[in-house]
Amino acid sequence: MKASDLNKSTVDELRSTEAELTKELFNLKFQLHTGRLEDTSKPARIKKDIARVKSVLRAKRG
């Protein structure tokens, strides 16, 4: 997910994307702690995507 792609999105789309990523991160953390997650770097990538979305949202708000 690139910030340039996020800049083209509306605020509502960004909020829904943030919610989806947060849910996905929760599920990945659960899988990680139960030992079912094979790609252990995925939670870190999702965290970075959430940070990108929040940065773009903050920039669009003001």
From Swiss-Prot:
Q: Which CDD domains match?
A: Ribosomal_L29_HIP
A Pfam family that this protein carries is: Ribosomal_L29
Q: Name one GO cellular component term.
A: ribonucleoprotein complex
Family matches, as InterPro entries: Ribosomal_uL29, Ribosomal_uL29_sf
Q: Which GO terms describe its biological process?
A: translation
Keyword set, alphabetical order = Ribonucleoprotein, Ribosomal protein
GO molecular function terms listed in the Swiss-Prot or TrEMBL record = structural constituent of ribosome
Keyword Ribosomal protein assigned to the entry: answer is yes
Checking SUPFAM superfamilies in the record gives: Ribosomal protein L29 (L29p)
Identify its protein family: Belongs to the universal ribosomal protein uL29 family.
Q: What is this protein called?
A: Large ribosomal subunit protein uL29
Q: Which gene encodes it?
A: rpmC
